[in-house]
Structures are given as structure tokens and as C-alpha cells.
């Protein structure tokens, strides 16, 4: 509304960033259902950040994109980055099960309610699965039991997008996976001021040029 009211003038640049937490990234985009584009038929950016890009386009609705460039990679979760001697199933054959921050024991057994609707899907036939049931599942070939570095993931774990608009304005979006906590930030700079904020905190600041 403040943008529509012209409080910060014409938009020069929009910067948005989504920090995907380490436990969300590993569960959904490395071990889980959106980890492999050949199976889920979508990309990481579309699966996780389509709302961020929609929001940017909505705020820039007075103009249209003319150029888009994007770069990203599967930087972190690759076999060559696994700790020395790492197994393939964390709780079955890995000596790092108690120390690796991505081990299924630390992510799912120590926090059994974390992403439970994904991780414990194979136990939905049980009315009230016990911790013993969950431990047993994490010793099988279940996708969520795998070593984080030895999955069939092929989507990026970080990506940057740069948009050039017809008006001359620019926009950037950064998706960074593996952060300590989830965060969505935005910073909009206009000819008369700027707005920046954090969506998790529902806190936004307006600065005006005096």
C-alpha cells in the first residue's frame, strides 16, 4: 500500500532473499520429494521461491521484465563432500551418525515432530508409531534415512536471479539453502525512500529521503 501510495517514489531496485533452513533443505530438497527434477518435474526455484518471484512481479506491475539471468549449483550435497568413511544409511552404517548435523538421528529421531508429515509417511498405517518404530524405519532404505551426501538429488541448493525491467529498474532474488534458520528478507529502494523488512518477524521499516 505504501508503494502504491507513492511514499517511496518509483522503484529503482527490489532485493529479495529466501534462506532455506538446513533441516528444511535436507528434508524436502535433498532427501525428499522435491530433490530430483526428473521425478518431481519442477525446479528448486519454482518449488520454493515462486511466491517470491510473483511478489516481485506484482510490485513491479507498472513495467515488464526484459532480461533475466540466473546462476546456481548443487554446491554442498555431493558424494565428494561426505565425511571420510561415511555410510549410505545414517543409522545403519555411518560412524558420523552422532556428529553430522544432517544425520537422520539428529534431524528426525532427536526431533521426531520435525517435518513429520514427510519423514514418517511410511508409518502412516500405524495409529501411533513409537520412537522404536521410527528408529527401525531410519535403518531401512527409506529415502529419508539416506546419507545427505549420497542421495539422488539434482536440484540446486543455492541460486541467484537478476531481472532487468523495461523501466530501467532491476530486481534480484537469492535463494540460499542450508541456513541456521528460515528467513525471508526484502529491500525495496525507490526514488523517494526505501522499505526493508523480515517476513518471519512481520517487521518492516520505511525510510524516506528528507
Where in the sequence are the language-model features?
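Predominantly a Rossmann-like dinucleotide-binding segment in NAD(P)-dependent oxidoreductases
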Residues: 1-138, 144
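Glycine-enriched catalytic-core subsegment of oxygenase/oxidase enzymes
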Residues: 141-210
Amino acid at each position: 500500500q505504501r508503494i502504491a501510495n507513492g511514499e517511496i517514489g518509483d522503484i529503482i531496485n527490489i532485493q529479495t532473499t529466501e534462506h532455506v533452513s538446513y533441516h528444511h533443505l535436507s528434508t524436502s530438497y535433498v532427501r525428499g520429494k522435491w530433490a530430483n527434477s526428473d521425478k518431481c518435474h519442477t525446479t528448486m526455484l519454482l518449488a520454493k521461491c515462486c511466491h517470491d518471484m510473483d511478489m516481485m512481479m506484482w510490485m513491479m506491475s507498472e513495467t515488464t521484465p526484459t532480461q533475466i539471468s540466473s546462476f546456481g549449483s548443487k554446491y554442498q550435497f555431493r558424494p565428494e563432500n561426505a565425511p571420510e568413511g561415511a555410510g549410505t544409511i545414517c543409522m545403519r552404517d555411518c560412524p558420523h551418525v552422532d556428529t553430522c548435523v544432517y544425520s537422520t538421528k539428529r534431524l528426525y529421531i532427536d526431533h521426531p515432530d520435525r517435518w513429520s508429515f514427510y519423514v514418517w509417511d511410511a508409518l502412516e498405517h500405524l495409529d501411533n508409531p513409537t520412537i522404536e518404530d521410527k528408529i527401525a524405519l531410519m535403518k531401512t532404505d527409506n529415502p529419508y534415512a539416506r546419507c545427505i551426501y549420497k542421495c539422488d538429488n539434482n536440484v540446486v541448493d543455492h541460486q541467484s536471479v537478476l531481472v532487468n525491467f523495461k523501466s530501467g529498474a532491476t530486481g534480484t532474488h537469492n535463494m540460499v539453502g542450508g541456513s541456521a534458520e528460515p528467513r525471508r528478507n526484502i529491500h525495496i529502494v525507490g526514488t523517494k525512500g526505501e522499505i526493508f523488512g523480515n517476513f518471519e518477524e512481520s517487521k518492516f521499516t520505511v525510510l524516506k529521503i528528507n
